[in-house]
Amino acid sequence: MESKSILEELLLKKSQQKKKMSPNNYKERLFVLTKTSLSYYEYDKMKRGSRKGSIEIKKIRCVEKVNLEEQTPVERQYPFQIVYKDGLLYVYASNEESRCQWLKALQKEIRGNPHLLIKYHSGFFVDGKFLCCQQSCKAAPGCTLWEAYADLHIAISDEKHRAPTFPERLLKIPRAVPVLKMDASSSGAILPQYDSYSKKSCGSQPTSNIRYIPREDCPDWWQVRKLKSEEDIACSNQLERNIASHSTSKMSWGFPESSSSEEEENLHAYDWFAGNISRSQSEQLLRQKGKEGAFMVRNSSQMGMYTVSLFSKAVNDKKGTVKHYHVHTNAENKLYLAENYCFDSIPKLIHYHQHNSAGMITRLRHPVSTKANKVPVSVALGSGIWELKREEITLLKELGNGQFGVVQLGQWKGQYDVAVKMIKEGAMSEDEFFQEAQTMMKLSHPKLVKFYGVCSKKYPIYIVTEYITNGCLLNYLKSHGKGLESCQLLEMCYDVCEGMAFLESHQFIHRDLAARNCLVDSDLSVKVSDFGMTRYVLDDQYVSSVGTKFPVKWSAPEVFHYFKYSSKSDVWAFGILMWEVFSLGKQPYDLYDNSEVVVKVSQGHRLYRPQLASDTIYQIMYSCWHELPEKRPTFQQLLSAIEPLREQDKP
């Protein structure tokens, strides 16, 4: 017996082109919606003819409007789409009222359907690709969040299946969490209580009734508070954090919904996973490797997606080609690069394509790692200066000379690579030394070089910091600059600006910002280093004592005239650094000595636009060189100015 009709209307239908040679035509059909199906019929002389097609309601996954194509005729001004298990149907209503009526009726019937789409395609599929995102597979995952999903998706809400605010695997503390005593309590949000093992109770009974509070001053560390007495600090790196929220499902992060937590792979364990590296940085690293099939996997700029970046070099092609492939999810929540080869996880997908190109330019042959043998956050500083044991540090080779002594590559505990700044006796006072150590200890940001500890019981004093693989930015620009594109140079400036914005927000002044004092990491991100001249000031201004050395060519007028330092003098220096980057390491004011630079700058002379800098980029660096400090932008404003220029670099 046929179900009762909910809605009937004569609508225009676009051919679904299920076959490659099918014509792209439009026909009027009588659409009939019932509780179980959406069917369409021939219609002639006010009579329903034979049925031409039907879609089961339970198979429909999305019903939504479609953006108009260019030069759309009058009769096709109100399109909507029906995405179902076996295809995609475009239908045109006669007016907006009719379209809204159909959308409302269809969405009401599909409410609670399995496999409803979180994202859909807002553009038509035309000439073998979606107009909205240029994806060429008709079954490709959507690019636009479907707003109706939240209302139509029926979540499992009974107590048996409801996800807790913080799932059980949120905080999983190993038996040997390093702990450091705290004198005073810290305020913050209180997390659920879990059993924990402190260093004292390791191997005995677990310590219960513990609260975990994220520390605002150091995001890598959480406060561990006993409900009754003492406080400890536990490193958040060793607390397995897996924040569950309604908006971020397993599927949205590239894992099938059906997979259990045991099956979810930790991608950071794989050498080929580069995390949040940018498109331009991945291209530079792959070209540096220069091997056919060099590859890495990175987070895409599209939330929850991954991209495989792959290098190939044809005969007589000196530069080579880098292709970027999105990892897609099909209707069964399987992952794929090539549609016919689907897998449950990213590692399985990569393993397959390491042996089969399957539609890619070449197979994945040589993983390019951005990982270095760094000290994990779990053993870095939490609170107070950490006096390291000198005998645990092996010096390997000299890296260079700093203001206060030699910098060496070292190995800590025979395991971790570190940089060791060796302070000569008499090079600076102990007060200066501990001021630097305390300053560095308070700074924790991805774009600042990490401070690990000190050896201060005898000379030479050691300052032990993060080892940055590719050395100083200035030398990197000189040796690799010709292979860098403008967008990659801009990314370097943005990294430095991020680090400086952090210093600015904490009222720290660097006082010696330049390309020579920034370092290039293994993933080509740039970190700000050398805080030997940094001071903490409450009024954001520090007046230097007369006779103090300072780098004239990077100094603002108020520095070389009045010895006044502020965040705005750092901004001036950042403008010079941008000039260094876009001139690939040239010396600023190379035709003048220091005394001539003072005269020229005081007269209003400024550096010229480097050839690789666009007018817009030059305007940004030029804004840093305003004679009046208050007229210069803040680092936060500089970030906002640079950000739109980076958009073109996103995949």
Curated annotation (Swiss-Prot):
It is found in: Cytoplasm. Residues 272-368 form the SH2 domain. It holds the Pfam family PK_Tyr_Ser-Thr. Specifically expressed in the endocardium of the developing heart as well as in the endocardium of the left ventricle and in the endothelium of large arteries in adult mice. PROSITE patterns: PH_DOMAIN, PROTEIN_KINASE_ATP, PROTEIN_KINASE_DOM, PROTEIN_KINASE_TYR, SH2, ZF_BTK. Its cofactor is Zn(2+). TEK and vascular endothelial growth factor receptor 1 (FLT1) stimulate BMX tyrosine kinase activity. Activated by integrins through the mediation of PTK2/FAK1. Activated by TNF through the mediation of TNFRSF1B. Residues 4-111 form the PH domain. The modification Phosphotyrosine is found at Y542. One of its GO terms (biological process) is apoptotic process. It is an enzyme of class 2 (transferase). ATP binds at L399, G400, N401, G402, Q403, F404, G405, V406, V407, K421. Non-receptor tyrosine kinase that plays central but diverse modulatory roles in various signaling processes involved in the regulation of actin reorganization, cell migration, cell proliferation and survival, cell adhesion, and apoptosis. Participates in signal transduction stimulated by growth factor receptors, cytokine receptors, G-protein coupled receptors, antigen receptors and integrins. Induces tyrosine phosphorylation of BCAR1 in response to integrin regulation. This is Cytoplasmic tyrosine-protein kinase BMX. It comes from Mus musculus (Mouse). The gene is Bmx.
